[in-house]
Amino acid sequence: MAAFDPILTGFPGLDQALDSTRLGDNVVWRVSSVDDFRYFVGPYVEQAIRDKRNLIYIRFAQHDPLVEERPEVKRYTLDPNVGFEPFTIEVHNIIEREGFDAFYVFDCLSELQVAWAADLMMGNFFQVTCPFLFQLDTVAYFPVIRGRHSHDAIGRIRSTTQILLDVYRGDGTYYVQPLKVWNRHSPTMFQPHRFDGTRFVPLTEGHAIGRFYQIREDLPDSEQHLDSWERFFTLARMQYEQGMLSESSLADMCRLLITREERMAELILRHFTAKDYFRIYKRMIGTGTIGGKSCGMLLARRIAQTNMPEYTDYFEPHDSFFIGSDVYYTYIVANKCWDMRIQQKTDTGYFAVAGVLKDRLFSGTFPPEIEQQFREMLEYFGQNPIIVRSSSLLEDSFGNAFAGKYESVFCVNSGSPEERLREFEQAVRTVYASTMDPSALEYRRRRGLDVKDEQMAILVQRVSGTNFGNFFMPSAAGVGFSHSAYRWRDDMDPSAGMLRIVMGLGTRAVDRVDGDYPRLVSLDRPDTTTMTTMAEKHRYSQHFVDILDLTTNQLTTVPLAQLLPHLPQWYKYKVLEHDFEAESRLRQRGRYREVCFATCQNLLSNRAFTRMMRKMLHVLEENYGVPVDTEFTVNCSPDGNFSVCLLQCRPLNSGGGGEQSIVLPQLDESKTLFHTQNASMGGSRHVALDIVIEVDPAGYCGYPYARKSDVAHCIGKITHAFAGQEKKILLLSPGRIGTSSPELGVPVSFADIAECSVLCEVSDSSAGYMPELSYGSHMFQDLVEADIFYSAIFETEQTLCYRPELLHPFPDRFAELAPEFPELSGIVRVYDVGGSGLSLWSEMISGEAVCGIAEGE
């Protein structure tokens, strides 16, 4: 049959009143109960069977079936609780398989609120499903319950469907009022119609019309127009105020607002009060959950403040807003990207379609009702800087950190209201688009998360800091770990925790910075550093600061020396040290100026601060049951006080290494590749190696600067060649692995080294290469989650032995594995050591790591 051809509905009078239902029509019946819909769907089913139609029933609701089981009807039973995306894609796949001219009955759309909690997602489902049905010239019946949905939700249905009918029951019969009939018209089509047993008679006489409107008026809840989200929280608030809020209602609020992940939900329910949920609800934009990052931040704050009452005045309060996860899919649907999203979820389109979809997400528009909520939020913040942070459903959960995989964007927020709105909306687009970044896609696929529902919620935080004239920043910021797997002294206690702290914005602590060295702090010995001389302290310290520039309206990195004239003396005292030796040399030449570097030394000398951080990290680990990773800022005042703003907390997957018993072999030096002490991360383990990739420091140093990235690509090519072979690979690389400055090390991405089991950063002072663990950086998080062992090979007493010549007798497979990089032969070597007995042993308690060949291995 051709598109728009008339079909029979089982009600000849209705066919006449509507000028026939047509192929391509989606017919939405707004009813007071599902039973009212049954009255009309029964004849439709019988007529379709008589006409030998391909009849399909989509079953997903809790109400009794609308169509009985019979051979002539195909039934698909689906579960909307799996999530919007899997459910909607499965419906799409069914429709695609059934093809053209199919006839459908769907369960009540209002029941989707039970699974998805809000109108927003029900409307999204209809807006993506209805057009696909239309394209295939189908006919589909959908019931929806009157009074359960917002005006906006019904408006979205009205704008998408071809036919919308209002059904009322009264005086022993049914009334039907067409609200929309696409591409059809008659003088009485949109009048209320009364069913007299055979015909649908339009009401034109005054008494009959008056009686119809009286029936409408008498219906309960007919004008409520609240969706289930609003109804639920309104009722919960009333129950709370009356002292009648149940434990099950608290569990429902946790599920709807915060998380459905079992371990996180258990912690939330243990620590949150009813007021906590209502505060979140009050600061929500849209609906859905607030995502993993927001969940972790709020949970950590509640745990810390409950268990550390003596530090209450030292915690900076938060006033964050949360863009619900439903808004992400609403944005995709509103910008007509859903078909592309479905293609991207396939095996062939997973990477291929992602780039195009990313561009579309980066340039979309927001629905007016969402944009209005953005405006109201920005009015609250005024011209205070804010940060727009990813908070996906799976992010920062047990086992999945997603560290650095999604974007966070600072908004300096200093322009006019319209300028600030444009800046903010672009920041949200950037976060949404980052879900299609190759690194995020690869991360999800490697961890088996590519088939899971991964909606993107957003956390909007006021940037914690101080205005220093033309720039804005906190006094200090950093990352804190409740357990340190990296010690540089025998007498350090890993359970005391560790900080990686910087002056200014914390981006220099969580990202692997180039040319700078954040301060590494063991909280049992906060004054201790790895450096012994003033020259070393100066060289391996922070010389650049990340700030928000209020004149250029952007995040900027500036040299510390450029900031010095603008900093008050009390602040300098807290975070800076003077290189008195350098200042003395300058004075001898008749030059008088400050030579400073940032170490946060006097802040760390404040025992109130370090004791607070140590206790906070301990309390969080104790309650989470695993080590945790946090982000924080510190703001100091001229009178010596300080406040800590806890920005983020996530459980740290500590990998396969641990405190299990490992006996280090006593190797002859001639059989030792390296032996380090207090320079590794990854716990106790034994790894029998198959492949060693070595990058020669001198060769890499002499290689043309503009082509040093070739070395990174080459390493990626080699490691990918071993994918799926379960080979144990060791990479020896000069300087910093993963730097973006090739003069400091090889600029590999994590994807280039993800197949490795062991990484070693090798020091070479003659070439200027210096390892840096970057504890707390996103690269560090990737190593931890992938269970990759790390060691630094310094030119200090921490390295007891390093003999790369041990590898030279082994066959070099470079030419075989990287033939397209002949110029790198001799710079990159690929030693096949399989079966040789070359192994790594690491013992966590002593902090020693040994790699070599033991007898009998």
Located regions from the model:
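Flexible inter-domain linker/hinge segments
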Residues: 202-279, 455, 463-471, 550-558, ...
